[in-house]
């Protein structure tokens, strides 16, 4: 995705709510936020009071807006479709989203500063010297437009990655499933499959005496047949007596008129729409992430954990049927109070506003060298005059490389820990202290953990492992990835502070341990995010804008 996607959990729930007024309110607040930053650009100097300086007009600003808005789309296209970078590779995605993305932004800014010949007042004076030049207001608008493009990509790309569910403790609000159940209750009770409802929620739809094993097997075979669902153009479903399996995969309700005949082929299929369910269909073999779709949220009591300012429903590890794999669909509890809604809106403003300030500051810092024009030093700040009067290589070594590296390190320290927790622990919530008892319990409960990347994972209770020699544990690289002990550290905390380690190594271990503890807290993530964005924004303004 884009850089903002690493913090999407802080604001996507308000855009994925099932209540339209919350989504509309969120959209209005986000539009107002970007409009406020665009309006703030009027405070900057529109053009220099010098007849020989480049004076951008409305077309130049429109070109700046278009370059800033659509460049993230181009970068996203190259990243996703051309290079096909998988979201599973966390470190690689951080490298692509920050240092490489900053270099790409620098290239676009260089193209924006390309020399232009301009006719001056009266057409008598021509611009004799063509130089690379961009004014700070152009870089400012470019940064806002870039943030707007990233925000648009993030919203569109995550609309189906978040799902709102009802609070188990509060009988208010509707989820998607409850809405479907309500709709089905208002229609014919014998056609439950057309609305997406199951007998689990409406137990009195079909008499239990009519449910037989053969009918269940027939429904299962009919739904799992590729020939009936995909390749056959003359699909005639079979209608069992007093059963709704004949309408599987269809939104069309078909009456059962002939009750004496057990199977009646239906030949009127011209306007029938076949809808596939990859969970109970043979098409689940065509995707690597189908296991993630089998999250039995309605068949178990999920664990509720608070994080990112919301309450999340995560699979219950004590349930045997729980799928222990990374789940891209994050389920959050619906808003039940006005305070929760206001908190979500404030989080959205804080995170999105921080990203806008970060991109504005980056564009101002990266374009600092091209603001300078020789012979007009009195129009620029001392920082612009210092770096602009020197070579481009000096600017790259002293400003570009240190800034890009520092930006990558800080953002990695902000997001990496939370993403590792989401990936390996199947959770969006807070975790207990990593004491010996807790880790031992996690090792025992996650002994059969299978990571999506480990296709050849060998379970510890597998006969191959049990029959292996005492010196062979049968562990492969995929099993090591899912090993909770390796992720959390040694079972004995004293092993991390061995006396024979050097002082530097002990310091690094202690630093990493403190970072792991801090990076789990939302206050740390939001605090560092806002502080760094504000620092970059202020640095860019003071360095390029002559106050």
From Swiss-Prot:
It is a multi-pass membrane protein. Its main location: membrane. The chain crosses the membrane at residues 20-40, 65-85, 90-110, 140-160, 341-361, 395-415, 524-544. Residues 1-19, 86-89, 161-340, 416-523 are cytoplasmic. The modification Phosphoserine is found at residue 225. Keywords: Membrane, Phosphoprotein, Transmembrane, Transmembrane helix, Vacuole. The keyword Oxidoreductase does not apply. GO terms for cellular component: fungal-type vacuole; fungal-type vacuole membrane. Signal peptide: none annotated. It is found in: Vacuole membrane. Residues 41-64, 111-139, 362-394, 545-547 are vacuolar. The keyword Repeat does not apply. Residues 242-253 have a biased composition (Polar residues). Residues 237-271 are annotated as: Disordered. This is Uncharacterized membrane protein YDL180W. It comes from Saccharomyces cerevisiae (strain ATCC 204508 / S288c) (Baker's yeast).
């Amino acid at each position: 995705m884009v850089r903002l996607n690493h913090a999407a959990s802080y604001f996507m729930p308000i855009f994925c709510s099932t209540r339209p007024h919350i989504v509309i309110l969120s959209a209005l607040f986000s539009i107002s936020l970007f409009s406020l930053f665009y309006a703030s650009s009027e405070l900057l100097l529109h053009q220099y009071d010098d007849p020989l300086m480049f004076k951008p007009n409305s077309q130049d600003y429109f070109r700046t807006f278009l370059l800033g808005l659509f460049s993230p789309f181009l970068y996203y296209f190259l990243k996703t479709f051309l290079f096909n970078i998988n979201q599973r590779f966390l470190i690689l995605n951080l490298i692509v989203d920050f240092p490489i993305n900053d270099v790409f932004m620098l290239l676009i800014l260089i193209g924006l500063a390309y020399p232009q010949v301009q006719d001056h007042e009266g057409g008598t004076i021509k611009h004799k010297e063509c130089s690379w030049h961009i004014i700070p207001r152009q870089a400012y608008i470019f940064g806002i437009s870039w943030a707007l493009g990233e925000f648009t990509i993030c919203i569109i790309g995550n609309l189906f990655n978040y799902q709102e569910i009802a609070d188990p403790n509060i009988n208010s609000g509707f989820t998607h499933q409850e809405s479907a159940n309500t709709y089905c209750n208002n229609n014919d009770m014998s056609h439950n499959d057309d609305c997406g409802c199951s007998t689990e929620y409406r137990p009195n739809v079909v008499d239990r005496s009519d449910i037989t094993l053969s009918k269940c097997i027939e429904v299962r075979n009919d739904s799992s047949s590729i020939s009936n669902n995909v390749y056959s153009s003359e699909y005639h479903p079979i209608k069992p007596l007093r059963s709704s399996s004949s309408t599987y995969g269809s939104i069309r309700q078909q009456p059962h008129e002939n009750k004496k005949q057990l199977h009646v082929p239906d030949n009127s299929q011209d306007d029938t729409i076949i809808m596939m369910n990859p969970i109970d269909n043979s098409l689940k073999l065509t995707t690597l992430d189908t296991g993630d779709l089998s999250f039995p949220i309605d068949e178990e009591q999920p664990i509720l954990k608070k994080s990112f300012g919301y309450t999340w429903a995560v699979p219950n590890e004590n349930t045997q049927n729980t799928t222990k794999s990374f789940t891209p669909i994050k389920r959050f509890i619906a808003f039940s109070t006005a305070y929760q809604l206001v908190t979500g809106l404030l989080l959205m403003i804080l995170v999105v506003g921080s990203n806008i300030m970060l991109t504005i500051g980056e564009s101002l810092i990266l374009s600092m060298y091209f603001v300078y024009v020789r012979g007009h030093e009195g129009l620029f700040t001392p920082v612009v005059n210092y770096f602009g009067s020197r070579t481009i290589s000096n600017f790259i070594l002293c400003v570009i490389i240190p800034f890009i590296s520092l930006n990558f390190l800080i953002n990695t320290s902000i997001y990496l820990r939370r993403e590792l927790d989401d990936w390996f622990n199947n959770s969006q919530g807070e975790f207990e202290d990593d004491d010996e008892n807790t880790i031992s319990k996690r090792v025992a409960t996650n002994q059969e953990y299978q990571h999506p990347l480990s296709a050849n994972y060998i379970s510890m209770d597998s006969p191959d492992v049990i029959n292996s020699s005492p010196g062979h544990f049968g562990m492969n690289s995929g099993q090591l990835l899912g090993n909770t002990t390796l992720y959390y550290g040694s079972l004995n905390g004293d092993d991390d502070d061995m006396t024979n380690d050097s002082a530097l190594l002990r310091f690094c271990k202690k630093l990493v341990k403190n970072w792991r503890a801090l990076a789990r807290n939302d206050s740390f993530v939001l605090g560092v995010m806002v502080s760094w964005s504000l620092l970059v924004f202020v640095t860019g303004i003071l360095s390029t804008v002559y106050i």
